[in-house]
Regions:
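C-terminal ends and interior cores of transmembrane alpha-helices
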Residues: 89-115, 122
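Cytosolic juxtamembrane N-terminal segment immediately preceding the first transmembrane helix
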Residues: 1-29, 34
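Primarily marks hydrophobic transmembrane alpha-helices of the MFS/SLC 12-helix fold
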Residues: 88-89, 151
Length: 161
């Protein structure tokens, strides 16, 4: 009798995890590349003399980036202590989407726009420390040989952004 080993399959969650990360990175890099130019030319900083707008826009940009890289501490702590990786990634992804809604709705309202940037930084920070390990958690000993393929794709997506 010829028995073959069962073929291990790719976990069905993987495309969704990679897709979520691709959207998050695309969004972050898109905002990062145009935020200063947008702020200089928009009504958000119209109260500042034109000669000082670029400096003020860079201050906003750097505050946003600091938030993006500070909030992973909060996201990791919440996942480890209270909610787990899945729930934390899910809810912080929704916070991220709410931030984009604020940017779209409040393009000419300073408080609404800054709230959107804050929510995006919070959402990005909540996702950042968890998504790689959450991706790895989807594999068992039966399909761990597929993990290299997935992580190659995962890091390609992150860097392609």
């Amino acid at each position: 009798m010829n028995q073959t080993a069962p073929t291990a399959r790719m976990p069905r969650q993987i495309p969704f995890i990679i897709g979520n990360e691709a959207c998050e990175r695309f969004s972050f890099y898109g905002i990062r590349n145009i935020l200063v130019q947008f702020l200089v030319s928009s009504v958000i900083l119209a109260y500042i003399p034109e000669a000082q707008r670029e400096g003020a826009a860079k201050d906003v940009f750097h505050s946003f980036v600091i938030g993006v890289y500070f909030f992973p501490l909060l996201g990791g702590w919440l996942a480890d202590r209270f909610f787990g990786k899945y729930n934390t990634v899910l809810w912080f992804s929704l916070i991220y989407c709410a931030g984009h809604a604020c940017l779209a709705l409040f393009e000419d309202n300073r408080n609404g726009f800054y709230t959107g940037l804050f929510l995006i930084a919070l959402g990005s920070g909540g996702i950042k420390p968890l998504v790689v390990s959450f991706c790895g958690d989807q594999f068992t000993t039966a399909n761990k040989h597929l993990a290299k393929i997935v992580f190659d794709a995962f890091y390609w997506v992150i860097n392609f952004g």
